[in-house]
Amino acid sequence: VLDVWFDSGCTHRAVLENHPDLRWPADMYLEGSDQHRGWFNSSLMVAVATKSDAPYRIVLTHGFVVDEQGRAMHKSLGNVVAPEEVISQYGADVLRLWVCASDYSQDVRLGPEILKRLADAYFRFRNTIRFALGNLFDFEPEKHTVPYEQLTELDKFMLHRLAEIGDEVTEAYEEFDYPRVFQTLQRFCAVDLSAFYFDVLKDRLYCEAADDPKRRSCQTVIFEIAKALCTMLFPMISHTAEEAWQHLPNWQGKPESVALTDWILVPDEWRNERLAERWEQLLRIRDEVKRALELAKNERRVLNPLEAKVTLLTNESLADFLSGFNVSLSEVLIVSQVSVQTDEANLNAVPAEEFPNLSIAVELAPGEKCARCWQRQESVGQDSEYSDLCARCAEVVRKMRDS
C-alpha cells in the first residue's frame, strides 16, 4: 500500500476502465461530507494527472446520522438506533421513507418521535393506495376504461393534476431531491386525493349503478392514479409499491413487477390549463362553502353537511361561471342540494372571504333522508317499492335486483 487515499483514488482507473459493463467516468460518486478532502479529492487528483478530466460526472454528498437532539450516536449515550430494530418495529419501507424524507445535505436526525411521524406518513400513502385498489374491484381496464373525451370535467381535472404531480416528481428525482418527492406525493395524497377527489367520489362509487358511465369515468381515473402512485413511490417504499402493483387489475401487457414498468407517461390531452384554472376557482368557492357549513354545524342548523341545502347568492357573472360545469355542484360540495340565486337576499347568508360578490346560506335540505345515500331529497317516499329511498337510489336498487 503506497497510501490509502492514493490507492482508493486510483479505483476508477482500475475498475471502470477494465470492467466490460462499466464506463469511465463514473456517473456519480456518493459518500459522506468528510470525503471532500478524502476519496473525492484523491480521485480527482489522480484523474486530472493521468487523464486531464474528472473521474465522475456528479458528486453527491450527505451528512451523518445523529439523534433527535443532534448528538452523534454512541453506545455510551444509549442513543444508537439499529436499522434492524426499526425494520422489526415499523417495516423496511418506513426506514426507506425516513431516508428519502430527510435533508441529506446536512446531518440527518433519527429517533423514536421522528420514526413515529414517518410511520404516520407511510400509512397515509398506504391508505390512499388501498382506497384506490378497493374501488377497482370490479374494474377491467380493457373493458371499462372510458375514453378521455367522455370523462367528467372533474375526472379530467384530476388527470391534469396527476400530470403536474408527475412532472414535479420526475424533476425532483432527476435532481436527487428526495425530500421534495416525499413532500409532493404526501401533499397530493392528503390534499388532492383524500381531502377532495376521493371524498367527492364516494357517492358515485357507492351509490350509482355499477356500470353507470359516471362511475366508470372515475374508476378510469382512479386506475391511472393508482398506477402512477405505484411507479412514483417505488424508489421510496419499494415493498409497498410492489404489493400494490400486484393487486392492480390486470391488463394486456401489464409488467410482472412495478420495477419493470416504464416511468409515468402522460398523454398530451391530460394537460388542460384552461380547465384547471376553472376548477381551481371552483375549489376556492368550495372552501368558502365548507366554512359556511362548519358554522351552520356549530350552530346546529344542520348536523351533517351531507343533509344540507346550500344557496349561493351572487352576481350574474359568477352565476354563469357556476352553471358552466357539467358536474353537479351538490356532488362537488358534498351536500344534498345546491341553488344559485342572483336576485334574492338571505339574512342567514355568510359573506365569502375571497369573493366579494358571494354569500352562502346553509339550511336543512327539504325532503327526507335517503336510507342509502343519506342525502335529503324530496323524492324519498315517492317510490312504492322502496319508500325509504330517493328516486335515484330506488332505480339503482331495482336494477340490481333485476339483473
Where are these regions (language model features)?
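Short cysteine-rich clusters marking metal-coordination/redox-active sites
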Residues: C370, C390-C393
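Cys/His-rich metal-chelating microdomains
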Residues: R376-S379, C393-V396
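Acidic, turn-prone loop/beta-hairpin segments
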Residues: F139-D167, F198-A292, A296-D320, S339-T342, ...
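Short linker/helix segments within small regulatory modules
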Residues: S379-D388
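A glycine-rich helix N-cap at a beta->alpha junction
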Residues: V327-V340
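Structured secondary-structure scaffolds
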Residues: V1-F139, M158-K202, T220-L233, K369-R372
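Flanking scaffold residues of small Cys/His-coordinated metal-binding clusters
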Residues: A365-E368, E385
